[in-house]
């Protein structure tokens, strides 16, 4: 999707800005469902990943399960972060650190964009500012 590609590009730009290695092996792609974590988490762990950033909270919940299945503790061994802050995120074990989007504002932007398109008015870009919700699935970087 366009959003996935934008997130990927932001990741690459951030890695470049900090002179860090960029490799496809660190950027697996899968469906945005918990079961998709099975396809990638074991490989990331075998590469020595100490943190996994997931495209949404469902994928992050699956990543937590997969880490446990492979004997890793979250967050002691691996930090996991999601995106969306769906209601179940705070109830996971451990509660999931995530990025919250303002759903009301997102809905308003969608409405105004659709209204503009219906009325043949060009649609402008809106950048919504997400909020990092720190819970217990992340820990400080290990040295």
At which residue positions do the language-model features occur?
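Bacterial carbohydrate/catabolite-sensing allosteric modules
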Residues: 1-143
């Amino acid at each position: 999707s366009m959003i996935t590609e934008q997130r990927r590009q932001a990741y690459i730009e951030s890695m470049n800005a900090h002179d860090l290695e960029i490799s496809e092996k660190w950027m697996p792609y899968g469906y945005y469902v918990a079961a998709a974590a099975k396809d990638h988490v074991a490989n990331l762990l075998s590469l020595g990943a100490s943190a996994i950033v997931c495209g949404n909270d469902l994928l992050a919940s699956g990543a937590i399960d997969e880490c446990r299945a492979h004997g890793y503790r979250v967050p002691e061994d691996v930090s996991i972060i999601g995106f969306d802050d769906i209601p179940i995120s705070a109830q996971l074990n451990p509660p999931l650190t995530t990025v919250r989007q303002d759903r009301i504002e997102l809905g308003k932007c969608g409405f105004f964009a659709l209204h503009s398109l219906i009325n043949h008015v060009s649609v402008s870009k809106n950048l919504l500012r997400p909020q990092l919700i720190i819970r217990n699935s992340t820990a400080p970087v290990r040295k």
